[in-house]
Each structure stands twice: as structure tokens, then as C-alpha cells.
Amino acid sequence: MAETKVILTKTVSNLGHSGDVVDVKSGYARNYLFPQGLAFAWTKGAEAQIVAMKRARLAKAVATREDAVAAKAAIEGTTVEIAAKVSESGKLFGGISNEAIAVALSDKAAVNPKAIEVETIKTTGDFPAKVALHPEITASFFVKVVAE
């Protein structure tokens, strides 16, 4: 099968980051990457676009790294308390979602719910959690679940 060189416009997992030139199968490019706006075809004239995208990504990474360091200082080692409905045996009705944890963390720093790593919470108690603030920076904290 023929391969095509494409320039990624957004980060694609298991493929590359924005601005990277990658070789992919023609069908993958034509049927997925191009329609989703994740890439465009590589041409000699697109080299200038690649350089501009990489410069923009580097500038954004420096800014977000500084923000991530500040957010880590605010979050690291803290305990977030979440109240939930509990049965008499101490089990939750449902569970605690990453979105609920992100809302509870919002007074300290804005975090992406998808970046939070925590075990499934089905009972009251303290649970260790991590949040990836930047590809190189993670913060550890605790989630305390109490009865309403």
C-alpha cells in the first residue's frame, strides 16, 4: 500500500504532535486525518508552515510549563473534599467522577478532567490521585470522600 507524507495540525496519539511530518497509509490520511482536520498533505511549500507551527508550539509549551509549575505548587499535597450520598454500609450511590474532582480542584487551579488519574471511588475515605498538568509535570493530591 502507498504511504503519504502528511503534516499534523493537531497532536494525534500514537502518531505525533502538531507540526510533525509523518508517513501514514494513504487511506488513513484520506479517510481519517484529512476529514477530521488533523493533518494536511505535505508539500515543499509547506516547510515554512511547519517551522511556524513548531515555533508557536515551543512558545506555548514554555507558557504552559510555567502555568503548570504554578498549578503544581497550588495542588501538590493538598486534600480535596467531596461530599456524596452514602448508603448505611458506607458505599456511595454511584461514584466520584473525574469531572467532580476537577470542579473541587477549580479553586486551586484549572485542570482537565481527562488528566486526572485516580482509582475507582465507590466508598468514603481518602484516595491518592495524580493530575498531569504538563507532559513533564504531575501533581499528587488526595481526594477525601465524606457522607452528605
Curated annotation (Swiss-Prot):
Classification of source organism: Bacteria, Bacillati, Actinomycetota, Actinomycetes, Bifidobacteriales
Keywords: Ribonucleoprotein, Ribosomal protein, RNA-binding, rRNA-binding
Family membership: Belongs to the bacterial ribosomal protein bL9 family.
Alphabetized InterPro entries for the sequence: Ribosomal_bL9 (IPR000244), Ribosomal_bL9/RNase_H1_N (IPR009027), Ribosomal_bL9_bac/chp (IPR020594), Ribosomal_bL9_C (IPR020069), Ribosomal_bL9_C_sf (IPR036791), Ribosomal_bL9_N (IPR020070), Ribosomal_bL9_N_sf (IPR036935)
GO molecular function: rRNA binding; structural constituent of ribosome
Pfam (any one): Ribosomal_L9_N
Superkingdom as given in the UniProt entry: Bacteria
Name recorded for this polypeptide: Large ribosomal subunit protein bL9
Annotated gene: rplI
Gene Ontology biological process terms in this record: translation
